[in-house]
Structure formats: structure tokens, C-alpha cells
């Protein structure tokens, strides 16, 4: 794909040179399946100059401590919830965290009031399901399921707009790190590196309170 024709490239595309330079000079310990160490992720978000002279552009102007706590939360295998008013860079930060850690910010679920549980778990290609019955070929994985299978970060936008019963399904996935597929008598067990970054709007309190 020619990025000159793309109105808004993904973070891992727009800042590919910076991510490559950070990975090449990153000698610090990395959690399993992380592309960069936590220290390098901080540098990617807040900016700095690498030992080889590469300038890293700041992606976030704000409290360094908040960024460090967010990254430490993910590094200790806990999901991250970014809460704030509209326009406070929650989505921007979540995208760049996923890009720096997993190299992929596209495993995204957009929360809405009508979001079904299948959007967090899996669905079916009904044409194949009717023709072949339940099979792996007929299964349509959600972004969260793909993140579990590949050890990457899934992003969930506007968590409080999602119905409470669907939120409950997410809690089970995060606590058990397993997604049962009873139709196939199978399950997906999350690989190391899997995690979730969710955002929530302060002004949506009362729409669907967090479970």
C-alpha cells in the first residue's frame, strides 16, 4: 500500500522508522511477545534521542508518571482502562501503545449500545455454517480472539457504551485467558503478550456502568 494515498496511516505505519530504530537499540528486558521493552515504549510515547542520534517524536504531551503507570500495568499482565473526557487523547494513546508493544494497532472493537457478545468472542460465516456445519473454516474470529491467538493487544473503544452483559463476557476472557468454543468442542488459550486496552468517556457514566 502506498502511504501517500492513505489519509490516516496506522501508528505502526506512520512511525515505522522510529519503531525500527527503537527496536535496534533496545537492550532492556522485554515481556514475552513485546516488540519493545517498557522503557523503550516510554521513549516512543514521550519522545527522546537514541544513542545513534535518532530523534523520537513525542506522541503524548502530559504526565510522564501516567504513561509509566499505564505501561507497567500492561507489562504485569493486567488490562488497561483509559478514562477521561472527550479529546484527552485516550484513543491516540491506546493506538500508540498497541503499535509499540505489538506492532499492530488494528485489533479494534468499537463499543456501541447494540454491540453483541459475538463482537468480543467470535461469530460465524452463516453460508459456510449451513453448508458444512460448525467448523474452524466457518468461524469468524473477533479482534479479541485474534489478539489471544497471536499474543497481541486488542483495543476496545467506548467501553461504557457496551451493554453490561457483554462487558461480563470480556471480564471472563481477561480473568481466564481462555475463550471456549463449545460448538467445536475446543477453546482458544491466550498466548503471552495478549492484553486489552479499553477507553471510556467520563460523560458516558450512567449509560452502562462498568461491571
Regions found by a protein language model. Give the residues of each.
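AAA+ P-loop NTPase catalytic core and its hallmark functional loops
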Residues: 2-211
Amino acid at each position: 500500500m502506498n502511504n501517500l494515498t492513505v489519509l490516516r496511516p496506522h501508528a505502526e505505519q506512520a512511525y515505522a522508522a522510529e519503531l525500527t530504530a527503537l527496536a535496534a537499540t533496545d537492550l532492556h528486558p522485554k515481556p514475552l511477545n513485546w516488540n519493545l521493552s517498557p522503557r523503550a515504549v516510554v521513549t516512543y510515547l514521550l519522545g527522546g534521542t537514541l544513542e545513534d542520534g535518532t530523534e523520537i517524536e513525542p506522541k503524548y504531551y502530559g504526565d510522564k508518571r501516567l504513561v509509566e503507570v499505564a505501561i507497567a500495568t500492561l507489562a504485569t499482565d493486567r488490562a488497561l482502562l483509559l478514562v477521561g473526557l472527550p479529546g484527552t487523547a485516550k484513543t491516540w494513546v491506546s493506538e500508540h501503545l498497541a503499535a509499540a508493544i505489538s506492532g499492530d494497532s488494528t485489533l479494534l472493537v468499537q463499543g456501541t449500545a447494540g454491540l453483541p457478545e459475538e463482537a468480543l468472542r467470535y461469530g460465524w460465516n452463516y453460508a459456510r455454517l449451513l453448508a458444512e456445519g460448525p467448523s474452524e473454516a466457518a468461524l469468524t474470529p473477533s479482534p479479541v480472539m485474534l489478539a489471544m491467538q497471536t499474543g497481541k493487544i486488542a483495543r476496545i473503544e467506548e467501553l461504557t457504551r457496551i451493554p453490561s452483559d457483554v462487558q461480563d463476557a470480556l471480564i471472563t476472557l481477561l480473568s481466564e485467558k481462555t475463550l471456549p468454543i463449545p460448538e467445536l468442542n475446543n477453546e482458544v488459550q491466550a498466548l503471552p503478550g495478549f492484553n486489552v486496552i479499553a477507553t471510556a468517556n467520563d460523560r458516558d457514566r450512567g449509560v452502562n456502568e462498568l461491571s
